[in-house]
Amino acid sequence: MRTEMPLPLWRSALKGYAMVKVSIIVPVHNSENYLHKCVESLLAQTLEDIEIILVDDCSADASRDMIRRYEKLVPGKIVGIYLDENIRQGGARNRGMEIARGEYIGFVDSDDFVEPDMCRALYEAAQGADLCGADYYMDFDGELKDVNTDYGAGWRMSPRRRERFISRCGYFWSRIYRRDFLVKHDLRFPENTFYEDAYFNFLTAMHAESLVKAEGRFYHYYQSENSTMRRRNDPKQYERLAIPRLIMGECKARGLYDSHRELVLRKYMSMQMSNITYTCLDQFDAPDREKLGQIKEAIKADCPKYRQYRAYKTESLRLRIYLRLTMLSPRLTVLVHKADGLVELMEVLAKKLKRRKKR
C-alpha cells in the first residue's frame, strides 16, 4: 500500500518545526457525542510535550466545529486537519502522520479515551524502541474488562518473539511507534476501507526490530452495541475480505514474503479461514455464497498448494474443514453451516479416522 505522499517529502515535511515527544492522531467522523471526552483525556496527559492531531474525515455533524473550538482554545497543542472527502480512519490517520512532529506517534479513536499517564508511561518505557505498548481496557458502556497483552521479554525482536507477537497482539491502540521507524519503512494504513488495522499491525510487526511493554493499563477501547465489530448483517463486514490479499501483495512487494514466507502464509491463511467462518457465516443470517466464492478464488490464486503449508496444517480441524468445504463448493459450505452439529460430527469422524490410521 504505497503512500500518496512521496516518502522524501514525508521525511522533510517537518524541517524548521520543533519536535515534540509524542504526537497523538485522532481520526474523527461524526463523533460529536464522544469527542469531548476523548480530547479532554488527551489534554489531561501528564506528559506535557505532546501534540494532538484531530483529523475531521468529512463529518456531517458538529465534530468539525468542535475541533475548530479546541484549536482556538489550545493553540499549538491541538492541530486540526479538515478533509473534504471521506477516506475512512486509515486515510485520516495517514494525513495526520504526514504532519506529525512527534518523536513517537500514537493513535486514539474518537470514541475512546485514555488515562492521564498513558503518554508518559509509554514514552519513558520506549527508550528508542520501534514500538512500545501496554495493557488496556475493553469498555462496554462503562463495564470494564482487563485485557493483558503479551510482548515477550527483552528489547530486541527475535524470530520467535516476532511470531509470538504477531499471533497475540492484533491491535494498535495503547501503543506508540517511533516516527523514524514508520518513515523508514513507509508504514501507512490502507484507505477507504474498514479493518485497516490488521494490515498496519502486521506490517509494523514484520519490520520492527525492537519493542517494549510499559507497565500499567491506560487505554479505554469503547465497544458500543452499534459498533461495526458487533453489528450483524452489516455489509461493511465484507470489507474484511480484501485485507488478506492486500497484506499478501504488499509483503511480496516489500520482499517480506521471500524472507518470512511461513509468517506471511500463516497470517494469510488465518485471515482467510476467519473470513469464511466468522465474516461470511457467523455474521450473517443469510450467508452470501458469492462472497465465499471470492475467498475460494483468492486462495486458488495466492496459495494453490495451501494444503502443503504448515500454516494450514497447524490450524484447528474445524477451520480446516470449513476451508476444504469452501474450496470444494461455497454452496455446500452454506448448507453444512446451516445444519446444526454437522461440522462437529465431521470433526469427530475425522479424528476417529486419524486414530485408526495410527494403529
Question: Residues of each region from the PLM?
Answer:
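Membrane-interface aromatic/basic loop that binds lipid-linked glycans or pyrophosphate carriers
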Residues: 282-359
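Glycine-rich, basic loop-to-helix element that forms the pyrophosphate-binding segment
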Residues: 83-100, 107
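Donor-binding/catalytic cores of nucleotide-activated saccharide
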Residues: 89-92, 110-214, 222-235
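A conserved acidic beta->alpha catalytic loop
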Residues: 41, 48, 56-66, 85, ...
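Cell-envelope/extracellular polymer assembly enzymes that use nucleotide-activated donors
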Residues: 20-23, 51, 199
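Catalytic core of nucleotide-sugar-dependent glycosyltransferases
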Residues: 217-224, 231-258, 274-306
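Short, well-formed alpha-helical segments that are part of the catalytic scaffolds
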Residues: 30-44
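Acidic helix N-cap motif at the loop->helix transition within catalytic regions
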Residues: 34-36, 61-70, 113, 117
